[in-house]
Amino acid sequence: MKANNHFKDFAWKKCLLGASVVALLVGCSPHIIETNEVALKLNYHPASEKVQALDEKILLLRPAFQYSDNIAKEYENKFKNQTALKVEQILQNQGYKVISVDSSDKDDLSFSQKKEGYLAVAMNGEIVLRPDPKRTIQKKSEPGLLFSTGLDKMEGVLIPAGFVKVTILEPMSGESLDSFTMDLSELDIQEKFLKTTHSSHSGGLVSTMVKGTDNSNDAIKSALNKIFANIMQEIDKKLTQKNLESYQKDAKELKGKRNR
């Protein structure tokens, strides 16, 4: 009788231990490995040859960009700062002295800046990266004690959208002399991505042996590098000394009217 009781007691403890192990394993979240193989370089070298220097100053306002939610704040700041830096280099390459203004609003220019600036260059726009709905699929993990992975996946192609507008102003009057806009959706940029996130449930036993991969951040950085190069290439073509000097007459007239 005692032996039988010992056997029942052992079996009960074994059952409890097994249940505890199962509960522990089920409570563990699967591991997600985020790749970091792409650097956010944002490189561009002016393509046009350096021309003769002029005794004229151009005011460069800080870019005013908005970004989609999937672009990290640090990427936003670097994109904005590199845009200002490279446009400054492009203008210097065209023979102009550049005064960088720590504001994106033309109304914040001081009187002395308005007076000494031949032109002002302002930039605004939206930098958007979104999954192509025609080429992106989502797969959610189903709850389950055994075979649920506990991972939701989105796999597809990241494409750009939004715009960048460059406006050339006469600083004293604040009047626009010219502008051009780049439609980012027209750029041939397509980045494959796999975004993996934890499901609302913890997953089953198999989830402890599953490792998810997420390369969506690398796809974003790669796309931003290409968007940046395309934007700079277009600005380099437009902001030439020949084009900028064509506003000479109108700029003088507008500045003269405000000085009277």
From Swiss-Prot:
Signal sequence coordinates: 1-27
GO cellular component: cell outer membrane
Lipid-modified residues, S-diacylglycerol cysteine kind: C28
Covalent lipid adducts (N-palmitoyl cysteine), residues: C28
Keyword terms, alphabetized: Cell outer membrane, Lipoprotein, Membrane, Palmitate, Signal
Record's bilayer topology term: Lipid-anchor
Subcellular location: Cell outer membrane
Protein name as it appears in the record: Neuraminyllactose-binding hemagglutinin
